[in-house]
Regions:
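Helix-turn-helix/winged-helix DNA-binding modules
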Residues: 24-25, 45, 133
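Hydrophobic alpha-helical connector segments
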Residues: 56, 63-92, 104-107
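All-alpha amphipathic helical-bundle segments outside canonical DNA-binding/catalytic cores
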Residues: 110-111, 128-143, 159-163
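Alpha-helical DNA-contacting segments of helix-turn-helix folds
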Residues: 47, 54-61
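Short hydrophobic/aromatic patch on the recognition helix
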Residues: 37-47
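Basic, helix-initiating cap at the start of DNA-binding domains
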Residues: 1-35, 52
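C-terminal peripheral helix-coil segments that are non-catalytic and often amphipathic
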Residues: 116-129, 154-184
Length: 184
């Protein structure tokens, strides 16, 4: 992708993320294009529809989590930190995950791949340090992500959703810690 095209795509993603957070997922796409300083045609050249735009934002957020996780690989509790950050991401992007729920399985592969990559090294570091269970696998990251994301889809008050998210995280951390492992 040419540099100018990549910059326009990044502006679209940033404008969309801000607009969705501020105004919800129903914000008109032409307003996102205007905020990014591009035309509608540029928006649709990059993203065929709203779901594709939302998916791209979600992938970008998980890739950012991966970068931040790799920067902490010297911390033996990095996998526990990763789960905490993943739970926060799931709560912060509840609307995004709802919007992509109906996508085809293949469309979600970039999210699954980014999540696996983000957590794999952290899992290995924390396992080597004896901080998390030795029998955890990279595939368990997907199970944990589904569990941690469930409260964001609950039809409850925002306060209850936050409480459910915190409790889900506590349970997940307790499940993955090595037997007799210290609380982070």
């Amino acid at each position: 992708m040419r540099q100018d095209a990549a910059e326009r795509r990044e502006r679209l993603l940033k404008a969309a993320e801000e607009a969705f957070a501020r105004d919800g997922l129903d914000v008109p796409l032409h307003l996102i294009a205007e905020k990014a300083g591009v035309g509608r045609a540029t928006l649709y050249r990059n993203f065929a529809d709203r779901s594709e735009l939302v998916l791209a934002i979600f992938v970008e957020q998980i890739e950012d989590l991966g970068r931040r996780t790799r920067a902490r690989l010297n911390d033996p509790d990095v996998f526990l930190w990763f789960l905490d950050q993943m739970a926060a991401l799931m709560m912060g992007s509840a609307g995004l995950s709802t919007a992509i729920r109906d996508l085809k399985v293949e469309a979600m592969e970039p999210v699954r791949r980014s999540l696996r990559e983000a957590g794999a090294e952290a899992l290995a570091v924390s396992q080597a340090a004896g901080r998390v269970r030795a029998d955890l696998t990279v595939e368990d990251i997907r199970v944990l992500a589904l569990m941690l994301g469930a409260p964001s889809r609950a039809v409850v008050s925002p306060e209850d959703r936050i409480a459910l998210s915190r409790r889900s995280l506590e349970l997940a951390l307790d499940m993955v810690r090595a037997q007799g492992g210290a609380r982070a």
